Amino acid sequence: MYKKLKLTTISELIKNIYCSLSVLIIGCASAYAVEFNKDLIEAEDRENVNLSQFETDGQLPVGKYSLNALINNKRTPIHLDLQWVLIDNQTAVCLTPEQLTLLGFTDEIIEVAQQNLIDGCYPIEKEKQITTYLDKGKMQLSISAPQAWLKYKDANWTPPELWDHGIAGAFLDYNLYASHYAPHQGDNSQNISSYGQAGVNLGAWRLRTDYQYDQSFNNGKSQANNLDFPRIYLFRPIPAINAKLTIGQYDTESSIFDSFHFSGVSLKSDENMLPPDLRGYAPQITGVAQTNAKVTVSQNNRIIYQENVPPGPFAITNLFNTLQGQLDVKVEEEDGQVTQWQVASNSIPYLTRKGQIRYTTAMGKPTSVGGDSLQQPFFWTGEFSWGWLNNVSLYGGSVLTNRDYQSLAAGVGFNLNSLGSLSFDVTRSDAQLHNQDKETGYSYRANYSKRFESTGSQLTFAGYRFSDKNFVTMNEYINDTNHYTNYQNEKESYIVTFNQYLESLRLNTYVSLARNTYWDASSNVNYSLSLSRDFDIGPSKNVSTSLTFSRINWEEDNQDQLYLNISIPWGTSRTLSYGMQRNQDNKISHTASWYDSSDRNNSWSVSASGDNDEFKDMKASLRASYQHNTENGRLYLSGTSQRDSYYSLNASWNGSFTATRHGAAFHDYSGSADSRFMIDADGAEDIPLNNKRAVTNRYGIGVIPSVSSYITTSLSVDTRNLPENVDIENSVITTTLTEGAIGYAKLDTRKGYQIMGVIRLADGSHPPLGISVKDKTIHKELGLVADGGFVYLNGIQDDSKLTLRWGDKSCFIQPPNSSNLTTGTVILPCISQN
């Protein structure tokens, strides 16, 4: 079998050929055309040379060509079919008004172009301030234009004209969990659960459904199972008004009012469609797990986030910034113990840039999760924020029904510059609860946020709210109307967070405090204090220590926890740790653990934990965990055993599956709010994509997950690790996808073997230098003829038929079969077709 030449050798060969050509050029680099001095070519027949395709700089023959385009050094995520026309005996690129619009030129420039069209397009270099450069090797056109002639000034944002809604397709994003708990005495228990999202895309429309499934067993016998579809909805972006339209079962999205589940229609301005601005706020959820635990964050009984965490402090920092209202947090320990509390996800001061308006509106009927209709009236809700002055925003909203509930709110937000930012609003409710008279109530809310640049401190006083006894939220009205009596009439609530990093001490401090009081129930206060510091001990660098104290108050029960941890790096990918924990019973336990992530796709840990008596009696809990990352998903396994007490096993797998008319593939997990991109490698298997985040399957299909929306993203092929006998021409793809899109691109893949040979004509001579060798079957160029007929051909199939054309002459080559190839240079007879 003929061995594939190394890419470095190929690159050097090509570079040497083109470097040789470059020294033949006579004239300055800025000239529009050059000639090659054939006398400088060391060839037996200098006249037998055809370099016409190298003789013009920045020009192509008259015609239409598909190219990549750069505007002011920024790559556009589309290919353009650009036309070259003849002007003053030279060819020049010519753009249609539609192409100028796609590239972001202003209406004034487009109007000038429309008045000076040539064959339906405008030669843009007629404008002296516009210059172009054509890279023929990459077929890439660079355009330089004054920034004032472009609509969009932010180089990090892509205009709507270049957004890609993707292709039609379907997907399933899934998370699977399984657990087995076996006490030394008593019944065994098992649990299987799953949650995720399924979707279908058609044009700009996206159909989505959330699902969550849970089944419990006792000694292998099914005890209970539950399958819910919390939301089924249709949505699409509307770029013309920078908004998102949603139809179906959804949750209201509000920075003023509590969120509730409904069936209907909503329209919300999407700030991600705008140049960078305030991006909202999402809370950080912290806690301490006593064992291997499952942390679940939900809202309105819909799972938002779920993760397995090891014993010790944990922090969830990657919640979506669209979350508003109360979030329910549940920590399920492996021994069955459950801890619950609530976290308020309130927005920071509601500020909008001067002259801009942000809004959201919805109408329909409230429903329970799963879609069951409630005894509720039709409602309409809406809110807005308007940038009145440079540092002042006005905002407000309302919730209106056709029966016994109305609510109005108004507020103002201030950017106080060096003093931080502040907002204040008042909400009025008019409601008639069951068997009560109609009452009017008021709620007052304030938010404050300040970052102290000189000290690196961040203070957030989010969501201070005081409500009088007669104030009723929409959620409380829904519960009362449907005779749900387990809700509490909130009186006062607030959240305070403070973060400080002292660089000189390498010390970080984090404090959070949340307090809720009620008119008809006892109050609860949750707070946590965390101190962490890095330092060096002899040869051990970046030893980290942390001390965490937290109190969780839930249903008149206080749970205090204190946790101390020391982690010592062992090389670059291993860690030895010790932890000490005191729980609400004042029992102190110790944990020693070892973590190894030396393999980027495989990590594991072992630990032993227990109190002094358990270690003394050899009854400490022994734990082990293993995580395996693949291109198709992530596997997590863990187990715990305690002598004469219990053992438990846990497993989880998350991944995704995407299918389109071009093919289908399993791939790594892609979040429901993210887009994804399908790569078609024309049947080539094991093509590494985006630093091996994905690979193509046996059908040549790969999917890159979690591609950001409304942001220009470059996706790449790892050309250094291509399979044998495969080369990729377009190894970098640039795209800007809309929310939830399935992007698609087909790679220019050359599959087949390589030949290093010498082309010989019937009379013993060679074809001219610079002639292209093309595969007649697939219409692709496979190489260029060098001096003495030497050629490197790449991507040859057993049925390939190669052709060469120069002037009025042509010939064809029947390459040797791959099974008959030998190492070294191959003689390739080229049979004349004249």
Give residue ranges: language-model regions.
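Post-signal-peptide, soluble extracytosolic/periplasmic N-terminal scaffold domains
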Residues: V23, G27, A31-R279, Q584-T658
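Short, ordered, surface-exposed loop/turn motifs in non-cytosolic proteins
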Residues: L60-Q83, A293, G683-R693, A762-T777
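A short, amphipathic beta-strand motif
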Residues: A69, I285-G287, R676-A681, Y753-L761
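Short, acidic Ser/Thr/Gly-rich low-complexity loop/linker segments typical of extracellular
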Residues: D81, K692-I701, I778-F790
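Short Pro-Gly-centered beta-turn/loop motif in secreted/extracellular proteins
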Residues: L86-L95, T317-Q324, I701-D727, T738-E739, ...
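Conserved, compact domain cores that house catalytic/ligand-binding motifs in diverse enzymes
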Residues: L95, L162-N219, I357-D430, E453, ...
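Transmembrane beta-strands of outer-membrane beta-barrel pores
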Residues: W149, A178-A182, A204, Y213-F217, ...
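Feature captures outer-membrane beta-barrel proteins of Gram-negative bacteria and organelles
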Residues: L162-D164, I192-A204, N226-P239, Q376-S398, ...
